Amino acid sequence: MADVDVKKAVVLLSGGLDSATVLAIAQAQGFECHTISFDYGQRHRAELIAAERISRVSGAKTHRVMEMNMHAIGGSALTDDSIDVPVSGVEKEMIPVTYVPARNTVFLSYALALAEVLEADDIFIGVNAVDYSGYPDCRPEYIAAYEKMANLATKAGVEGHKMHIQTPLIDLTKAEIIQTGVKLGVDYSQTVSCYQADKNGAACGICDSCRLRKQGFENAGVTDPTIYASNL
């Protein structure tokens, strides 16, 4: 088969549960997947090791790690050492301190540039508006606006090669995401979700992300393979 017939996609891969599921979905849809991860100064750097491993084991065509210093900007518990990672439970009525200013816009822009170079029309990202309703850059209207911008601001878009921002998880609960991944053979023991995982990827068990992950497995009726430092 000629390369022109290959469906290519850029998949944002953090190394976490959601993005690993998105990669499996894209592959199940027949895309040749090119994964992209970001070393942006985050606390939980173990996710980068997980992302490389997931990409390799899944058979992704290529994997890239983009480096940027969002730690120098700060403003988030994930990038600013002066802001503690919350461990008291998920706040539903406010934007949480784990929101990283403009992160998805920055990440999608790198993915968009790569997609243009690869002549890929599709970008997959694991944003979710159900469990993380407080994140402004996880909302459907944000994705729609970004896709519109992508088609206005790129050579591909101007020449009629419409760019698509694919968000297959956006309306799913964490339990539904896990159930989908299990059906597709995702090995969740290889993923890292914790906001403050240690260098080996061991999860704290008490941050918002760990709480959502544990609850998701419980609601899905699936055994959680994660090793948690705390049973809270």
Curated annotation (Swiss-Prot):
It catalyses: 7-carboxy-7-deazaguanine + NH4(+) + ATP = 7-cyano-7-deazaguanine + ADP + phosphate + H2O + H(+). Binds 1 zinc ion per subunit. Its cofactor is Zn(2+). ATP binds at L13, S14, G15, G16, L17, D18, S19, A20, T21, V22, L23. Pfam families: QueC. Its EC number is 6.3.4.20. One of its GO terms (biological process) is queuosine biosynthetic process. It comes from the Bacteria. Keywords: ATP-binding, Ligase, Metal-binding, Nucleotide-binding, Queuosine biosynthesis, Zinc. NCBIfam families: 7-cyano-7-deazaguanine synthase QueC. Catalyzes the ATP-dependent conversion of 7-carboxy-7-deazaguanine (CDG) to 7-cyano-7-deazaguanine (preQ(0)). Belongs to the QueC family. This is 7-cyano-7-deazaguanine synthase.
